[in-house]
């Protein structure tokens, strides 16, 4: 199925996404979207008949077993902290002074 990227498609996508683009942004999006679709069309042209489908590209996951461990004690947790006060980490203010 060939998708035609034109002004109508861009306007339709604008309406679906509830955004408003300037004329310049519409032209940029139209060009970028056309390039993306061309790329996927090239991928679709590949002959993959001799390629066995994979469920996952890695033979097994990299997850470790969820084994309970002793937590860090306060002294080790605060050892490399720049600012601490009364046994707590002092972070930067995020609101007000």
Curated annotation (Swiss-Prot):
Enzyme Commission code: 6.3.5.-
Pfam families: GatC
An example Gene Ontology biological process: regulation of translational fidelity
Xref: Gene3D superfamilies: Glu-tRNAGln amidotransferase C subunit, N-terminal domain
Subunit structure: Heterotrimer of A, B and C subunits.
Family: Belongs to the GatC family.
Task of the protein: Allows the formation of correctly charged Asn-tRNA(Asn) or Gln-tRNA(Gln) through the transamidation of misacylated Asp-tRNA(Asn) or Glu-tRNA(Gln) in organisms which lack either or both of asparaginyl-tRNA or glutaminyl-tRNA synthetases. The reaction takes place in the presence of glutamine and ATP through an activated phospho-Asp-tRNA(Asn) or phospho-Glu-tRNA(Gln).
Official protein name in the record: Glutamyl-tRNA(Gln) amidotransferase subunit C
